């Protein structure tokens, strides 16, 4: 058996670099749909397949195809689309991108935010594809465990200026990739509260499903506030 890995290195002018230093309060957080599992979480998936005794050749009605075909759906690539958006809207419009890989949406998005910034993400703004709910049910995994591991239908996130958000949404959808507004960027007030959610210090222990995620993957940057309930396809 062999493990095969590939990597690519890009070069960009310093004046065109995106990242936390460009993100500001009021920026809009836009999701781009994933095509499926995106090559992440397959250790969990394999354990679920084994646990439920599923055959990869079996037809799954909720997928409309076999289990194997669903699990092996090719990963959507966003390279050309992301480059085109920067070319069209510039670094004044596109402030940061976050590729949602292992660790889930919040862990990856928080790393492209500046310290002190909080991106509010509403879970109810999209429908989680059926394959993720199949994994959740088959593995008896909580939604917290799922959102800390898999992309749940969001493959790429763009943090953009509010002034161009509607145009960016249209451009992504016109390129054939479903896109929607996840939320926006804000920051805690001087009293340590986030408008509509209360004290930051209380959010990590919130029992209503509100979670504040920060300091992930060894990076001390911004934070992501998850709220709302998932809709399942």
What residue spans do the PLM features occupy?
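Glycine-rich anion-binding loops of enzyme active sites
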Residues: 1-43, 184-186, 229
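Glycine-/charge-enriched secondary-structure boundary and capping motifs
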Residues: 1-2, 62-72, 76-233
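Amphipathic, positively biased hydrophobic alpha-helical segments used for protein targeting
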Residues: 21, 37, 52, 113-115, ...
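Acidic, glycine-rich loop-and-beta core segments that form the ion-binding/anion-interacting portion
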Residues: 23-71
